[in-house]
């Protein structure tokens, strides 16, 4: 991004926390950034930048757009937290020029909850894939089957179900291995080290170019709990790799069932294993 001429401004954010003090700090940080750089337009991504960035733009009278890349776990539950998020989204979305969605179900949820005027809603069907960068790759001929996971290693990505399914395969003496790419949440550091020693997982950290790993993979796996539109599914499909992914909006669109891949139940390691 820097090579393209972009200016990078780091904004510390607690992605999963609900501490009001921390979130107010983020809001005022956004306000100060807007005051300093005076942008013509702001495009916000993900829940906290959408909400607090949107509110900061309203306060500073800056034009802005929201991009809903997924609704997160809070939208799948009932209770005070969901009600609060819906209320904040309504405030943040009120003056937005447009609200982009990456799948129809997320847009439908916003319509049902009447978060903003429907005239603002635009469906993108994902961020898209550069098919010259992710072109068809010959299928590997290795005897050992390589499953591939790319993403943040966290509970909501379905990694617990994935690890359970892989352990079951490995216990049956199947000749397979799971290649894992991405940063991990603190809870998973010890687990990853343990599974590597057991021999069925290889952790490669964050990779700026995933193509060598996609080329080696026999199958891409993403058992996520929720997604906007999973680009890693699209990139793997564009490269000619079968996919196993969750039967949820944002994942299932990338698969023709039993032809280009398989769909599994969300939060179900047995379904994933089968």
What is the predicted role of each segment?
Residues 1-4, 108, 168-171, 177-204:
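Short, structured helix-loop element that forms part of the nucleotide-activated donor/catalytic region
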Residues 9-10, 90-136:
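Donor nucleotide-sugar binding/catalytic pocket of nucleotide-sugar-dependent glycosyltransferases
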Residues 21-28, 63-65, 73-95:
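Nucleotide-sugar donor phosphate/pyrophosphate-binding loop at the beta->alpha transition
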Residues 44-50, 68:
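Short His-centered aromatic/hydrophobic patch
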Residues 138-157, 162-167:
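Conserved donor-binding/catalytic core segment of Leloir-type glycosyltransferases
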Residues 206, 225:
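Aromatic "clamp/platform" in nucleotide-sugar-dependent glycosyltransferases that forms part
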Residues 242-245, 255:
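Short hydrophobic beta-strand element within catalytic cores of glycosyltransferases
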Residues 257-258, 262-269:
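Conserved acidic donor-binding segment of nucleotide-sugar-dependent glycosyltransferases
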């Amino acid at each position: 991004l820097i090579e393209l001429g972009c200016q990078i401004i780091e904004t510390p954010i607690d992605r999963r926390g609900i501490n009001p003090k921390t979130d107010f700090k983020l809001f005022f940080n956004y306000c100060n950034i807007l005051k300093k750089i005076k942008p013509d337009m702001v495009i916000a991504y993900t829940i906290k930048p959408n909400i607090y960035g949107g509110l900061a733009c309203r306060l500073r009278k800056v034009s802005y757009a929201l991009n809903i890349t997924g609704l997160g776990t809070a939208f799948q539950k009932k209770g005070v937290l969901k009600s609060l998020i819906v209320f904040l989204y309504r405030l943040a979305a009120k003056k937005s020029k447009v609200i982009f969605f990456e799948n129809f179900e997320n847009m439908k949820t916003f319509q049902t909850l009447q978060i903003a005027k429907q005239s603002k809603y635009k469906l993108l069907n994902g961020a898209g894939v550069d098919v010259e960068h992710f072109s068809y790759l010959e299928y590997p001929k290795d005897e050992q089957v390589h499953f591939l996971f790319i993403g943040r290693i966290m509970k909501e990505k379905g990694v617990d179900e994935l690890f359970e399914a892989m352990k079951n395969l490995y216990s049956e003496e199947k000749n397979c291995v799971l290649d894992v790419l991405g940063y991990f949440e603190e809870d998973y550091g010890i687990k990853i080290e343990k599974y590597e020693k057991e021999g069925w997982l290889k952790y490669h950290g964050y990779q700026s170019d995933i193509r060598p790993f996609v080329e080696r993979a026999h199958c891409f796996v993403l058992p996520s709990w929720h997604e906007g539109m999973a680009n890693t599914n699209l990139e793997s499909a564009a490269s000619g790799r079968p996919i196993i992914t969750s039967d949820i909006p944002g994942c299932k669109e990338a698969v023709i069932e039993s032809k280009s891949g398989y769909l599994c139940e969300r939060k179900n390691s047995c379904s994933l294993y089968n």
